[in-house]
Structure formats: C-alpha cells, structure tokens
Amino acid sequence: MQVRRSHGIALHVPDASLPQLQGYLAQPGRPLKALLNRNKVERLADGRFLYASRPYQLLNFQLQPEVVFRSSWDGDQLTIVFEHCTIHGLGRLQHLVEFQCQAWIRPEQERLLAKADLSLEFSPNGAGALLPKPLLHRTGDLALGLVTDRLEKRCRSGLIKGALNWLARNP
C-alpha cells in the first residue's frame, strides 16, 4: 500500500533577477545548506549528500530520518532525489516502510518555485499485511503532512534567507 502527496509553494525573493537566482541554485550545496541544518549535511561524491534529521514524534514513535540524496542543477531547475532513506525509531517496522521524495526548485524573476512529490510505501508482507489499510493510510497521510509542513517551513525561512544573503554578497 502506498500513500502519496504533492506539495508546491512560490517563494517571493524581492528584487532578484532570474540570472541571480539561477546563480544561487547552480551550486546545489548552497540551497541545500540553507534548507537543511548545515551541520547535519555531509557532501558525498557525485552530487550526493547525507543528511540526518533531528528526531520528531509521530504517534508512539520517536523518528529520525537519515537520507542519502542526489542533487543537480540542469540550467533550469535544481532537482533533489532521495536515493535511500532510513527511518530510525520504528523498531521492527523499520524495514517495512519506504519513504521516497523528489523535489524541484525552479527560479523565476523575483521568486523561487518549490515542489515536492512524496510517498510512503508499506510492505505488503509486513505492515501492509498486519495493520488495517485505513489505519495505514491515516498514519501515512499524517506522516507526509508533517514532512510537507517541515519542508515548507524550511523553504519559507532557510531557503529565502540563504538566497537573500547570497544575493547581498553577489549582486
């Protein structure tokens, strides 16, 4: 069973030109460190990064996602694709749930457009077989809601602040 969610936002970046915002996004480490806690982002080889989130509570679980993702700039948009995500804190259920995310940040005149497609997949031989589907769907939807809320908050604060700071240093 799979639960999906898409979420997008437009972020106003006053007085920023399209070439300036392209310059900001052209080196993926810049916006990623603005979006995520820069002390928890580790650059790996080939445009890949490792990130360990801070723990958060969902129902009776203290969850801490750890993600390996790839990020690249193609001249038009920054693409972020999760390659592997481990959700620590699920105990025996850990290997029964798979989280996937693909996100894009596209620059326009005076704004950044951010979009993410998220999914949680429950193993049909594990959690999908043990728990009622309505419960799995509600729990999955709640979890994805927490993730999108957190992503939007990071975009509205960290990404905008990072872009404005970079633009001030690189007019």
Set out the residue ranges of the language-model regions.
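Low-complexity, acidic/polar, glycine-enriched regions of mature
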Residues: 11, 24, 79-86, 91-93, ...
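Beta-strand/loop substructures that line and gate deep hydrophobic ligand-binding cavities in soluble
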Residues: 91-141
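A conserved amphipathic terminal alpha-helix motif
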Residues: 131-171
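Hydrophobic/aromatic beta-strand elements that line small-molecule binding cavities or substrate pockets
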Residues: 39, 65-71, 100-107
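Amphipathic hydrophobic-ligand
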Residues: 1-4, 60-67, 91-101
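Hydrophobic ligand-binding cavity/cleft-lining segments
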Residues: 1-58
